[in-house]
Amino acid sequence: MKPIIFLVLSLLLILEKQAAVMGQKGGSKGRLPSESSQFPHGQKGQQYCARKDKQHAESKRSVSIEHTYHVDIPDHDQTRTSKQYDLNAQNKRIKSEKHAAGSQEPFNHKQEGREHGKSKGDFHVLIIHHKRGHAPHGTQNPSQDQGNSTSGKGISSQDSNTKERLLALGLGKEQDSVSGTQRNGTQGGSQSSPVLQTEDPVHNKKPETQNSLQNKGSSPNVNETKQKHSSKVQSPLCSAQEDRLQHGSKDVFSKNQNQTRNPNQDQEHGQKAHNRSCQCSSTEERRPNHGEKGIQKDASKGSTSNQTEDKMHDKSQKQVTTPSQEDGHRANKTSSQSSGTEERRPNHGEKGIQKDASKGSTSNQTEDKMHDKSQKQVTTPSQEDGHRANKTSSQSSGTEERRPNHGEKGIQKDASKGSTSNQTEDKMHDKSQKQVTTPSQEDGHRANKTSSQSSGTEERRPNHGEKGIQKDASKGSTSNKTEDKMHDKSQKQVTTPSQEDGHRANKTSSQSSGTEERRPNHGEKGIQKDASKGSSSNKTEDEKHDKSQKQVTTPSQDQQSGQDADEEEDLLSHYQKDRHQHRSYGGLDIVIVEHEADDDDRLTHHDNNQNSIFT
């Protein structure tokens, strides 16, 4: 609207100046659209023009459009013609072109003006052509308008055009904002300054008609001209939608919002100051067969978690979690945290809920519910990371829960501030076994030397109501875990850890733990090795079919910038006792799985740096 207002104001100023000039020259004034044209007396053809203007004013009062015709005061012996051509009434235009006689011309103009009044309920074009030169027939045609010279024509035509432009803006109709003076500017080569316009000599009727049609050809669609002008005013930032506005679409902002709206956008906050973290939250949720409910919520502040749930139908379940997490820390001495959350929900009305609301870190919750027994599992690990300037500590907590058949419940909560505790509950099918592993993780953080720790927790549950949960909540790294459960006796697990840790601080170390598990059939052994930066964890889980045994390996990594912590997990079952011994060799944790036939044994192991009690 601002360009239109400026243009109107500039035209009004120009009209006032030329009105003063015309008052000095001939005393003629610019005529308003509602007024009749005022011309000085004693000149030929003025009565006809005034009469014709009155007739147009009467025929166009319904739509407030008038056609102005002006008399050239200095050159009153020369004929000046001004014609109007309607886009919707081309046949009338042809008639007006064909009739050269002056007696029939006013009737054509009357009919043309009346049909403009009828056809312009929503659309009208006003073209005023000021022709200069001698008449081709050498006679003054009373049916033709008497044009005027540059001074008189400029005032009256611009005044009427300005008024019509104001009417077009006030009525809100789709009319040509570029009025007759700008059409004349199109002929003369000037639209911005319609005061001084080059006038073509009228040799006959057809050149005038062609010139007027060329003026139409310059803007063939009045709606396009109006909408182009309005699109620049209403949506200056949306230049891509001028094509739509040219084709009649007026809802600019709603279409912009519909186009630019993306519900799965990742939000990245660039860090310019110290101790800032990138945030990127993407929540994925999958619901399997038979009315199951799976809810995952991930609101991570300072980290990124991607959750993927894949649920299969009867007995073959496959889950692929590929969280790609990027922490761009540009502050001095910052740590990045990432968490991978996996969730699986089987058949028959089971419910699984994951919530992850971590401030400065990301906690991953994994719920796995199985087929026949309709188990329920809720994991809520909360992670807190104390990041300070020049002294930052990164903490990661992996929470694992396992719930077997027969309506058993296992709840794990991990709220570690400065440390991470991993709890694993394993409940079995027939014998209803329970196994809790609680390794406590300690992070030795030194000033100007920060280390990021990641704990990968993996669980797998075989067939017959078993559950497998993998969790990887790594700070300063990202681990992607994939749980794959197969049909009867064959289980498959694919772990794809993509870990990206952008530490741009002075003296920061990022460590990533990728956990992979694979469980074959009938007492086979699967060994996982993870060579992380500064440490590696190897996990071995052995699951068997007939006895419905379950083995949970929860290695928690204590990573100091020069220290490796040992963790041991003892998994007790009624049929087997799995003894995991972690031996640290310069940053490598080797897991040796020994299967014994003892029942209900408990073992307490004291590490060098930790006291991990496994019950």
Swiss-Prot record:
Purpose of the protein: Predominant protein in semen. It participates in the formation of a gel matrix entrapping the accessory gland secretions and ejaculated spermatozoa. Fragments of semenogelin and/or fragments of the related proteins may contribute to the activation of progressive sperm movements as the gel-forming proteins are fragmented by KLK3/PSA.
Gene from which this protein is expressed: SEMG1
Identification of the protein by name: Semenogelin-1
One cellular component (GO) term of this entry: extracellular exosome
Basic and acidic residues biased stretches: 50-80, 107-118, 241-253, 283-300, 308-317, 341-358, 366-375, 399-416, 424-433, 457-474, 481-491, 515-532, 539-549
Family (UniProt): Belongs to the semenogelin family.
Biased composition (Polar residues): 34-46, 81-91, 138-160, 177-196, 209-224, 254-265, 550-563
Oligomer status and interactors: Occurs in disulfide-linked complexes.
Cross-referenced InterPro entries: Semenogelin
UniProt record, GO biological process: coagulation; negative regulation of flagellated sperm motility; sperm capacitation
Post-translational modification, as annotated: Transglutaminase substrate. Rapidly cleaved after ejaculation by KLK3/PSA, resulting in liquefaction of the semen coagulum and the progressive release of motile spermatozoa.
List of residues that carry Pyrrolidone carboxylic acid: Q24
Record keywords: Disulfide bond, Glycoprotein, Pyrrolidone carboxylic acid, Repeat, Secreted, Signal
Cell compartment(s), UniProt: Secreted
Residues bearing carbohydrate: N148, N184, N223, N258, N275, N306, N332, N364, N390, N422, N448, N480, N506, N538
Chain residue ranges for the region called Disordered: 24-118, 133-160, 172-585
Record keyword RNA-binding present: no
Highest taxon in the source lineage: Eukaryota
Name of one Pfam family that matches: Semenogelin
Signal peptide annotation: 1-23
